[in-house]
């Protein structure tokens, strides 16, 4: 029995290891039902909504289904007849980054040309009446297979000489950008190294610089329509590279990926010779840059929306990568790219209100898919703790980093707008260390402890006497909190804050988790 148990344990470990290294992952059975075919997937960038074509319709008719998830995928449902009818280009559906807006291709009147691009918005559980994008997006030709960027400000699509319910030919790829007023500019044709005669089904990845498309007019394919990837580098699209890890002798055309960019979802033949949806691990050299979704709300104490500005700054170069406002209900979402560190900031229109800052480090091997941040902006009250996440010090010093200037300016604005308060600058170190030797670069501070002892000795006449001896012990430590607090208050005074309105509080304790060092900086308002 013991040998059998050991064998089972080893078998379990081997299976787990193999699964961890798997290059393919089949979507769950609620989507890949064994009795139906599923094809042409399109997943929202946040990974929580999915469209696909299946023969789950009446009498096995092809239809477009929608599913979503908070944790697990829910039972797919057919799209309403206002969208899902014989007038559509069956595999030309797409979703916005949050899955709340759908773009699709239809020949249902009124249209500008043959097939046009339309959109519909999800309100609760109902899709709104489709709206034609009209000119200049649509033309007298056939437009289809739209693919929006993560920020919704651009749309990639194909314009074709011929199109019907199932197929298209003679296609070129275009990009169209939105004006500040929400209207569309004139579409621009992608360059000749992409448009070689019949390029179709563009899929712009969440990083907005990686484009996957299909073509049967680029040399070196495996047969039929093959998939290619091109990247936008310094304003130019690279020469397309075939996706050999998924291309086959058959038509390979409709694929999709979430913002993390690790896996590509594609239809393939599965059990019982039915088409199913499978995730394929994208090789590192072909993988788009992963994107993390930051979402949440900006409200007051009563959960009402507050007029505010959201900015995201790349801390590597100091450049602002995003600037915008929350929606009318206070909600927001934005995507940030892996590979650098960011400062996320929410600033109110009213100077007397608090503000919010948080730092993101997306330089590690794995990044989270989502960060949810709900911000409450309010007038400071005595005892409130306002985290000063944007204040950073140069390594192993009490010298403020230049990136701290933004946080200091915001703090000065708020303090000047609340003159009835004094503000206590708190600097708290979790991760205090000391040693009798300067054993690391972090141990920049020195403390001397003196110990007085009484020693009895015999003098030259043989008489006993006592004398005091002082022993001095030197310790090196990393508690720079008082110097750091003073550096902050000095900067505030230089910016015009009266020193009488400032206090400091510092403390240093050992790390709660060994090796987990944290420096927490706060501003706490107090009544005068």
Describe each PLM feature range.
Residues 1-23:
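Bacterial Sec-dependent N-terminal signal peptides
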Residues 21-297, 301:
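Short, conserved micro-motifs composed of acidic
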Residues 205, 291, 366-385:
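Conserved "repeat-terminator" motif of extracellular CCP/Sushi domains
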Residues 224, 301-317, 403:
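Short, ordered, surface-exposed loop/turn motifs in non-cytosolic proteins
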Residues 267-278, 378-382, 421, 435-528:
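Periplasmic OmpA/Pal-like peptidoglycan-binding modules at the C-termini of bacterial envelope proteins
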Residues 315-331:
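Short, acidic Ser/Thr/Gly-rich low-complexity loop/linker segments typical of extracellular
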Residues 330, 340-351:
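A short, solvent-exposed beta-strand micro-motif common in secreted/extracellular proteins
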Residues 349-374:
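Structured interaction patches on ligand/partner-binding surfaces of diverse proteins
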């Amino acid at each position: 029995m013991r040998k059998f148990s050991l064998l089972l344990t080893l078998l379990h470990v081997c299976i787990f290891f193999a699964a961890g290294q798997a290059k393919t992952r089949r979507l769950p059975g609620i989507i890949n039902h064994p009795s139906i075919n599923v094809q042409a997937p399109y997943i929202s960038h946040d990974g929580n909504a999915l469209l696909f074509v299946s023969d789950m319709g009446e009498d096995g008719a092809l239809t477009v289904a929608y599913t979503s998830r908070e944790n697990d995928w829910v039972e797919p449902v057919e799209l309403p007849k206002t969208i899902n009818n014989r007038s559509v280009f069956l595999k030309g559906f797409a979703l916005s980054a949050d899955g709340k807006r759908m773009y699709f291709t239809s020949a249902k009147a009124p249209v500008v040309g043959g097939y046009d691009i339309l959109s519909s918005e999800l309100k609760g559980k109902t899709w709104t009446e489709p709206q034609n994008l009209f000119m200049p997006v649509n033309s007298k030709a056939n437009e289809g297979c739209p693919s929006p960027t993560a920020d919704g400000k651009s749309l990639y699509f194909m314009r074709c000489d011929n199109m019907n319910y199932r197929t298209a030919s003679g296609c070129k790829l275009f990009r169209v950008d939105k004006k500040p007023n929400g209207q569309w500019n004139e579409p621009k044709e992608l360059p000749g190294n992409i448009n070689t005669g019949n390029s179709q089904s563009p899929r712009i990845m969440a990083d907005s610089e990686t484009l996957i498309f299909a073509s049967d007019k680029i040399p070196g394919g495996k047969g039929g329509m093959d998939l290619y990837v091109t990247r936008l580098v310094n304003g130019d699209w690279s020469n397309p590279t075939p996706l050999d890890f998924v291309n086959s002798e058959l038509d390979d055309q409709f694929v999709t990926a979430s913002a993390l960019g690790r896996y590509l979802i594609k239809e393939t033949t599965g059990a019982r010779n039915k088409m199913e949806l499978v995730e394929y691990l994208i090789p590192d050299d072909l993988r788009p840059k992963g994107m993390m979704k930051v979402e949440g709300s900006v409200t007051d104490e009563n959960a009402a929306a507050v007029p505010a500005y959201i900015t995201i700054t790349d801390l590597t170069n100091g450049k602002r990568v995003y600037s915008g406002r929350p929606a009318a209900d206070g909600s927001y979402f934005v995507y940030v790219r892996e590979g650098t560190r960011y400062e996320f900031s929410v600033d109110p229109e009213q100077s007397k209100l608090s503000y919010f800052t948080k730092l993101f480090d997306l330089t590690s091997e794995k990044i989270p898919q989502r960060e949810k941040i709900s911000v409450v902006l309010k007038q400071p009250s005595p005892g409130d703790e306002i985290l000063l996440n944007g204040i950073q010090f140069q390594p192993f010093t009490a010298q403020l980093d230049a990136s701290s200037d933004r946080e200091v300016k915001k703090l000065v604005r708020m303090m000047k707008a609340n003159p009835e308060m004094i503000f206590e600058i708190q600097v708290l170190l979790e991760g205090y260390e000391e040693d009798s030797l300067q054993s690391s670069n972090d141990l920049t501070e020195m403390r001397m402890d003196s110990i007085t002892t009484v020693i009895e000795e015999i003098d030259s006449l043989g008489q006993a006497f006592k004398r005091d001896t002082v022993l001095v012990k030197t310790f090196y430590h990393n508690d720079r909190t008082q110097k750091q607090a003073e550096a902050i208050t000095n900067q505030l005074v230089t910016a015009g804050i009266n020193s009488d309105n400032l206090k400091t509080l510092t403390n240093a304790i050992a790390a709660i988790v060994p090796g987990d060092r944290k420096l927490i900086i706060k501003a706490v308002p107090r009544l005068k």
